[in-house]
Amino acid sequence: MSNSSFFSKLSMLKNVATPILSVFATTAAAQQRPNVVYVFPDQMRNYAMEFWSQPGFEGSVNSQNDPVHTPNINRFARESVVLTSAQSNCPLSSPHRGSLLTGMYPNKSGVPLNCNSSRPISSWLTDPVSWSDVMSQAGYDCGYIGKLHVQFPTKNSPQNPGEYVETQRPVWDAYTEPQQRHGFNYWLSYGTFDEHKNPHYWDNNGNRHDPHEWSPIYEAKHAVSYILNRNGERDSSKPFFLMVGMNPPHSPYRSLTDCMEEDYNLYAKQPLDQLLVRKNANREMRKAESVRYYFASVTGVDRAFGMILDALREAGLDDNTIVVFTSDHGETMCSQNTDDPKNSPYSESMNVPFLIRYKGHLTPRTDNLLLSSPDIMPTMLGLVGLHDQIPSVTQGVDYSSLFLDPTSKTVERPDAALYIQNMDGDKDKDGLVVNYFPAARGLKTHRYTMAIYITRDYKRKEILLFDDQNDPYQLNNIADKPENRKLIKQLTKRMGKILKEIEDPWATEGILAKVALK
């Protein structure tokens, strides 16, 4: 054989072997990566956790926490990095979830509004490379259980082709077809449906399940089965990424049809002044009696979360699993004299739980990191070693280095978080929303909360400004005080810089320049 022939064949073997070796290398790397379990009940405020008043956490938040019972979260907190200042920038279910999944703000994520059948402009489309896409491509088995609520409902019922999944109430619920699932290969989910003891779900193949069981417990049971792989739900040779989206403590919270009776009994006989303890709570509001059911739902969610933690221990996966407990947004629950539980810049609405445990890697502590919704995806990808696979269009920041080492200088700590409120814009002849109205923008720093609201003709309507350090319950709007004009201008300038960076309409359409204080 000539040398040229020999080297030619050697080159051919190399060309064949290289991709094979690459596959083996990728598989080996994936097997070494940690599992991820991400649990996020809806509408649970940061103050609705018992441990804030316990030794080691007292004084970490500068206002009174709720008198709730959360024994599992309490134990988990002692093993976790607990953020005191995580923010839901657009504190509504769908916009937050859009940011969570894509790492982008609502103006870019495709989900600027709460998803329903009148808002085709707000939906998690197949285009953006999402968190689960990256995880799946990196060799993860990906599972989604529970509430999704990021898609525009269409007439795509698997059981009744050409019909909505809820023909009597077609506005909200949605079925997610397989091609829209962004890498999730295990599926037990629905859009949004607020009958907590009468939930329904669609599985991988579009089969509908109606378990007639309080939804967080049902979801936790299936999360446990997925973790233990009882029915071959996942590929055991791969690390797994599991998201569990629980609906409670989201409303309704009016009766025992909304929560577990055993949890309600913990609060049933307590007077309102022992439950609504925050200094900005109005116990005369009609909603006040709901607090017992809301707290009962929080305690029930805690029990469901405990089931998931127990399964990880049983499976011996505690040490190699990153576990997050957080929420979409908060709940005002009679604070600020508003019936709207969310969508406002108040701390009860924006400030959400964010607890993350990664044994042997993250030192348990509290941290005041101003984490924003779009930061979660890149940060979590960073923690599993996928820094280089964060999509280039991601607007959030990878803060994984700060979770691993709070003194790290790899990335600058954020000094502010945006507040975003969008509303329906123009509608077509069929009543479908064709654009959104950017009703308010604001900024939250470690000391101040500011929000600027506009009218439909793009004039300044109102400015809110709170000194959260000296007025933690945000009882006094100090925006009209002449001595605070300079402060408002400074905060507005900082907000404008961020809005320009993310190409928000308040920057691109010149709205902020028009309504800012001169």
Roles of regions detected by a PLM:
Residues M1-L13:
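N-terminal secretory signal peptides that target proteins for export/translocation
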Residues L13, A29-I454, K459-K461, Y473-K493, ...:
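Formylglycine-dependent sulfatase
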Residues K14-I20:
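Sec-dependent N-terminal signal peptides
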Residues I20-A29:
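Hydrophobic h-region of N-terminal signal peptides that target proteins for export
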Residues L465-F466:
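Short hydrophobic beta-strand that contains or immediately precedes a catalytic carboxylate
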Residues N470:
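Extracellular, beta-strand-rich glycan-interacting domains
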